[in-house]
Design a protein with these regions (language model features):
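Extracellular and analogous surface-interaction loops
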Residues: 84-95, 137-144
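Extended, low-complexity, turn-rich repeat/linker tracts enriched in Gly/Pro/Ser/Thr and Asp/Glu
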Residues: 102-108
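Glycan-recognition and processing domains
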Residues: 24-80
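C-terminal segment of classical bacterial N-terminal signal peptides
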Residues: 15-22
Length: 165
């Protein structure tokens, strides 16, 4: 039991040390500035992110608790439960931002996406019975880099785009 407690203490200390690492400027609250990308695929539309607008094309759910940092950005609206494919090509070096249901975020983290500490500036919800939380993740891309955006869960993975593509 003593060894287990020592191990648990080391894990907690390591976790605290990792969490204490400061985020880079583009990941700090209010600093969500997506790189310009060319986006292709199927099963999505490009719409403007606003609170109380329809979140998914096949359901009446609306976005709620939309942080100011993403209000007015464009995004890929999915059907919800559909099978969209999303491919992007960076027009410039920068960060690509996506949002997934919180229950899916670790799947993207394993694929190289940055997961900032969730807070109210990088999370939002839609008004289903569970008030499902969406978490924003990011990834650095170089100019000309191409990327297939993995679609996860019922919500899919939405891509946040600059308001002036």
């Amino acid at each position: 039991m003593m060894r287990f407690c020592q191990f648990l203490g080391m894990v907690m200390l390591a976790t605290i040390g990792v969490r204490a690492t400061p985020l880079c400027a583009s990941e700090t609250p209010g600093e969500i500035r997506p790189a310009k990308v060319e986006i292709t695929g199927r099963g999505f539309e490009i719409l403007e992110m606003r609170a109380k607008t329809v979140a998914f094309s096949m359901r009446p759910y609306v976005w709620t608790d939309v942080p100011a940092g993403i209000e007015g950005l464009l995004y890929t609206q999915m059907a919800g439960g559909g099978t969209a494919t999303v491919h992007l090509k960076a027009k410039e070096a920068g960060r690509v931002f996506v949002a997934v249901a919180a229950s899916q975020m670790l799947d993207l983290k394993e694929k190289g996406w940055m997961l900032p500490m969730p807070d109210r500036s990088n999370t939002f919800t839609y008004n289903d019975v569970h008030q499902t939380m969406m978490v924003i993740l990011s990834r650095q891309v170089g100019e000309g880099e191409e990327l297939d955006v993995l679609q996860l869960g019922w919500t899919g993975t939405i891509v946040l785009l600059p308001s002036d593509p």
